[in-house]
């Protein structure tokens, strides 16, 4: 189930920030916290090539995923996902590179030569399935009691239904 294709933020560029350990002018979070929050935003892509999303806001207060400029090819599954808190008189401008993929991809592999200076490559988890648990119970069919029933509990980010996740995983096998 961890090998199902999904989408993730693979690189970011924050206006006024030189590297991932820099503070963000006017924001409560530093760049590392902002990156962690962006990686938690659940996404679903309708294309199979990288896309760039833009977040630009000057509204003081909490910045949420709903502030990201909409793209017809990328669906933001939780518009209320928290990103940062912005102070009065500040502007937050973030570009995000979103790619489809499978499983975990390290920041080294997410580095693209075509990205200009200022982009920070990120490690990414593309799988829409977050966690799986299973139970095996005794089952009865007619008079026979020597059957077992498998119950799967699938936690996901909303990009795929539990039924589709299990179906896609079965196809991969």
Where are these regions (language model features)?
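Protein-protein interaction/assembly regions in multi-subunit complexes
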Residues: 1-173
């Amino acid at each position: 189930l961890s090998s199902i294709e999904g989408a993730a933020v693979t690189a970011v560029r924050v206006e006024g920030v030189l590297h991932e350990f820099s503070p963000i002018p006017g924001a409560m979070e530093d760049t590392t916290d902002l990156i962690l929050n962006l990686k938690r935003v659940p996404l679903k892509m309708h294309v199979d090539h990288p896309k760039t999303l833009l977040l630009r806001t000057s509204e003081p207060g909490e910045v949420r995923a709903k502030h990201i400029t909409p793209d017809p090819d990328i669906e933001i599954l939780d518009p209320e996902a928290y990103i940062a808190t912005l102070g009065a008189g500040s502007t937050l401008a973030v570009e995000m590179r979103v790619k489809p993929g499978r499983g975990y991809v390290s920041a080294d592999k997410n580095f693209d030569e075509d990205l200009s200076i200022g982009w920070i490559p990120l490690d990414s988890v593309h799988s829409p399935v977050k966690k799986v648990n299973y139970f095996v119970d005794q089952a009865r069919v007619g008079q026979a009691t020597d059957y077992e029933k498998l119950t799967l509990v699938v936690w996901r980010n909303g990009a795929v239904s539990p039924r589709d996740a299990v179906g896609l995983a079965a196809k991969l096998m």
